[in-house]
Amino acid sequence: MKTWPVDLGSKLEVVTPFLGKHRPFVGRCCQRCTPKSWKSFFHKHLTSLGFCNVIKITEENTRYRGWLVRRLSYFLTVCDWQFCNDTPVNMQERIFHSKRVQDIVSQKVSQGKGDAPVASVSVAQWMKDIHRILGQIQSALSPFLLRLCSWALLKLLNQMFLNVILHKGQLEMLHRAVKTADVPVVFLSSHKSELDGLLLPLLLVSQGFSMPRVTWDYKAYTSKHRALLTHLGGVFLPPAVEQVSDSRMGVLSRAVLASYLEELLLSRQRLLIFLEEPFSGVPQLSASGREWLALVFNALQTGNVPDVLIVPMGLSYDVAPGLIRSGRANHTQPRSLWMSLRTICRAACQGLGCIRVDFAQPFSLQEYVANSAFRQSSSGKHLEELLLPEVLGKCPMNLDCEKLEYRSSDSYGAVALNMKQQTLMDNLSLHSLSTAVSCSAIMAVGITSALLLHKHQEGVFLSQLMQDFVWLTEEILLRNYDVGFSGQVRHVVLHTLSLLRRCVSLHRLSLGDVLVAPRRTEAAVTELSRHSAALLPVFIQEAVGACAINALLVELLPYLGSPEQLRDAVFVQEELYNKTASLVQLLPRDIILRQPCQSVYYYCQVAMDKLIQDGLLVAEEVTSDRLACDAAQKNFTKKLLWKATDGFEDSDSDYDEEAGKQCFKLSHLENCTDVFMFLCCLLGPLLKTMRRAVVFLEELECPQPESQYMEKLHQFLLRKANEDCSFDCANKTLAAVSITIYKELGVLRELPGQTGPFLHLSQTFAAKANQEKLEKFIEQFIWQSAC
């Protein structure tokens, strides 16, 4: 690693307190939804709290000693690993005799139009179809390929990364949970790279766990690539599950898939499901992850599997393989085996820093379902009913109502769930994603990228960057997130700059310091944006609250003589909550990580409390001659609409009508403006993309396929980004999120099509005036210096 002999004083050379003296135990399961699991695996009973480097293999990891063993340690270690048993030999017969498949054979399901009569299909033909579908789902494991690829992967990982870190206490917790529960185990992991599906099984096997079956996306890989992955333990959703519900092959594929998963769990094999889309940039549930989790949930609901142990996992890279070029990559084209090998080899030549893998506290799926079903509310409204009146300026939003999840009319799931079960499964997905993200360690590259992108866009001295790095790391640890690094501050920061060498330029100054300037090219801004997105979950509630305050300042600005007077503006607590709730309802729950057991009121309350704890908001007593930002319509907001049910401290019996009139103002401390801007900028890329998507509505002349609309919107965002170098807003994932939000809001309507849904502009937003109102509504939350 290249270093610079710069004398920055002794204060920054010491190991600061957050590096080694305090590391939070992250990833606790929800005490409300799974209280028994929360007690069973409490971390105070764990004895091992250190870390281990999984890819550091020596003769100590083998049963032998000697100079030859030291040279063959990787090979001998892999030979000692115990891989999981293969699926039962009679799997096909057991699936054929399962109730689901027998219902189809005996004509207990409806026939599809144009299909051959079911009675004319022989048993041999049924077995042949089941065999073909099973071949699309999985293949027999190859012990030779498993050991060969594990040995090669260990070699590559040592070339690509400095270390791959696991927490020993989390491993002990997981071993105890698996042994105590004695039920099937399903790992629900975050997803950062295509390497994850090979890396995580290797880590689990190396620590004495059975190798899990890994879920992969069928359409993302070529046939030869899929064949190799299935022999290594990969499983796929057969393509026929997406066919219309009355198609014979679609019905049979769904029945075979559901029966296969039940047999997999009953045979006590592990399953690894990725909850996120790779390279998404924001926490976002993947479609395939939902399907696999729905299958696990359905196996429990039918009673065929008594219980499942859910283990959320967090995965963090300094630099993920393939991340740099993922922005321009065409994800619609299947990846060949050669493309994947080329990506891995390129990463091995570059050096990508470190990896940290964390296991959250396991919990019982049966316990979660029982507790959540008891508390589940049937009331709720769609986003269009909740927020559209406020967007159009007609009346305030009813903040006391829960938002119903949007479901596309063109989608067909792998398993049929009723509305109550679907809601319960969606809540499980959100809970698991939130836990997986919260237990993911924050890497040094993400911290440095966020500082360069959101705070020091014009450049910063290395000494100041180190001070800000220390400050931001302490803030992360105070929010009960862990960091994936340790050591002297100078060494850590210089290491991150070496990994970000394509994104920054360094200039030695005559004063003995170094100027670090982020590049403004598309590749540099895109990479910094993707790295800095790791900090959004840490500060998401404060970011939502800061953007809500920014919206109130925008409303107040026309009534003031100059922007300088905004520092003395006073906000009424009720209006702060209203504006925060508007943004909370607008954004998807998986992005803002609002757990299903948290009401909108509770989420807004925590956001305001955190801003007060950070010192950004201070309480203020308002006199009659002071200007307070209380723009609420009094006939609709005579008292708070929320009923606090998230804790005893928020009991409705303690509600005081005057509490809603408590006032706050922005702090006048020196660094508060910078912190406020930093928090607003974390949500800036998403909000700015949404605003530009509104401007793009003018180009939607007629119904067109959603994929075509997405591509045109992405090209529009790229053109806008070229004008002001805002390439962090030209992300395809953010464009897709914007389209989903506007479909929920009633801006875009869906029409069914043969190749997919068609989008057209709703009648309400065909009017230019309503488009301008929507743009103004989004723009109020955006920090203006980032516009």
Which residue ranges define each predicted feature?
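Membrane-interfacial terminal anchoring regions of lipid-handling membrane enzymes
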Residues: 1-787
